[in-house]
Amino acid sequence: MEKLVALSGVVKSYGDTSVLMGIDLDIAKGELIVLLGPSGSGKTTLLNLIAGIDTANSGEILVLGKNLSEMTDLELTEYRRDSVGYIFQFYNLLPNLTVMENASLGLELKGEELDYAKIILEKVGLEDKSQRFPAQLSGGEQQRVAIARAMAKTPALIVADEPTGNLDKNNSQSVRNLFKEISNDATIIIATHDNDYLEIADKAYELNEGKLIKIK
């Protein structure tokens, strides 16, 4: 399988606090990867490094064959904008925009892009609620809009940080199922403390005291 992400000897610390110590990780195109660990274990830090939001102290991070540490500021901005889709625990939907408008931020809602936006909403099961506003949706439905938004520019990589942390059991299961369904369209990395994600993972790792341990 084609390698999309490759980390080698990645170290990250904040002041005297070591967070990640010598992380090695290869992710193939189309894989769904789950990073498990309690709060403070470094899951979010690792996501941010891969997404180009933060920088490592040492080591190498290659995404799409490019070394993130060698990118210019402009190249990093373009990488974050065009190649990475983000999903967070809090949906961050704009309350005055409809489901369609939130899901398609950055697209022009006409012609082929309008057709594509409709396809995305169909994928996440919200095609019949495209003109509703966030306040009219359940928490699970709002997170589905956030997932659709992350897919809108067909990113190579989707990173999700505790995407079901605020949802009840039924909505959490629904969102996990959706991640599995869309994993054919993008490489997905999910950071979570929820062991139920092991069911959908192609590979899973646990962060423990700065080290990455493969558990699936």
Q: Where are the regions a protein language model picked out?
A:
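Conserved ABC ATPase signature
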Residues: F133-Q143
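Catalytic Walker B motif of ABC-type/P-loop ATPase nucleotide-binding domains
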Residues: I158-D161
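Helix-to-loop junction immediately C-terminal to a conserved catalytic motif
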Residues: A51
